[in-house]
Design a protein with these regions (language model features):
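DNA-recognition element of transcription regulators
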Residues: 133-137
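Active-site-proximal beta-strand elements of phosphoester/diester hydrolases
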Residues: 166-171
Length: 195
């Protein structure tokens, strides 16, 4: 079972709601895995839910909860496989020495927005991969291993090589895994790391 962290968002009428994107459900279900949504309400209950999971996805979004840092630290300290996507990667980095800045050239509705050069990545080795991009801020420093950057120098992928699977990507593989072998490799590695 894979836990996906729900993100605070707003309905068209302005009411608060926790959401989990259907594309993430579809991606996990395509691997014959079940999904459990993790909605921040009590850190004790969240840890109990995380302990039931084989791995965790920290999804993208634009609003973090007050529990996010505790959740990520718990995942890290207990060596639970974790894939951070977009904001999820940013939160991973910020907890471990990260510095972030606003940018304005990495938001595109294109399937492939730019290339990322990977270096010593346990997923990709040393190569160039094509990714999508939908972020308005970027990590410029982190204590995690920086293993992928876009051609303009934006950090696009981080790992902790001492963990079973603690990987963050700035792009959205859940929108590419059906059409991109680069995205599929990442998801395959995450699934194969599950306890």
């Amino acid at each position: 079972m894979i836990g996906i962290l729900g993100r605070l968002d707003y309905t068209p009428s302005g009411k608060e709601a926790y959401i989990i994107y259907k594309s993430l459900f579809d991606m996990v279900h395509s691997y014959d895995m079940e999904v459990i949504g993790i909605i921040p309400n009590s850190i004790k209950k969240i840890k109990d839910i995380i302990d039931m999971c084989d791995g965790i996805i920290l999804s993208g979004g634009s609003n973090e909860s007050s529990y996010d840092n505790e959740i990520i630290k718990y995942i890290y300290d207990n060596n639970i496989p974790c894939l951070g996507i977009c904001m999820g990667m940013q939160e991973m980095c910020m907890l471990y020495g990260g510095v972030m800045k606003d940018i304005n050239n990495h938001h595109s509705d294109l399937k492939y927005a730019h290339e990322v050069v990977t270096k010593d990545s346990m997923i990709y080795g040393n190569r160039i991969i094509k990714v999508n991009s939908r972020h308005d801020s970027a990590i410029i420093k982190t204590d995690l291993d920086i293993v992928g950057k876009s051609l303009d120098g934006v950090i696009e992928m981080v790992e902790d090589k001492h963990k079973k699977f603690f990987v963050g990507v700035q792009w959205h593989p859940e929108n590419l895994y059906m059409v991109s072998s680069d995205a599929k490799v990442l998801i395959d590695k995450f699934i194969s790391s599950l306890k």
